[in-house]
């Protein structure tokens, strides 16, 4: 008899319901989906704002575990001791025996086939590595996609580093997001060179490009480019429902630098 049950489960969202287009990344998407088919632990690494979370969601949607894919957002978890509780909560598990959360998870995963996505684990790497290692050893049907800026360094881990967008992809992303702010916007002979240079100066980082495109209602591509010297101050804004660490380029980079502090 099971002593726990699901309550308000939180499976991975359907990428087809996203409100903005998923631009580029076709090769990376194929590669990551293939990695998830051949390795039980895949860690998607890359700098802040490079698009790891969205790629992970699309790749996870291509997998076909019997009980689906489940995502745990860890960026807001500051205490390593709360990692296991965060996973229990994301899975919607309610335990009625006062067992430790790790035991609840071990029992839950023991005979299930599913994909667990741990997103934003980099500041909790030791706690996550310990949990993932034990879960994989005791749950043969479990696969894990870890998403962060560093490896977990767990046995059997397959790394999948994510680079910034290519120049054509970056320009396409800028044009798509700009058209949402300025109806009818499109790349043409009058703005193409400025947009390409803008994306190059932003190093192909999707978050930075989206924030820049969001300023297009007030500034032209040429004006954005001219003011890019102070890019941290310029790129202020972002969607209200974005993660706190993604509201500004300054915050995204600050989040990355925080991880380097002893």
Per-range role (PLM):
Residues 1-262:
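Aliphatic-rich helical/repeat scaffold segments used for oligomerization and domain docking
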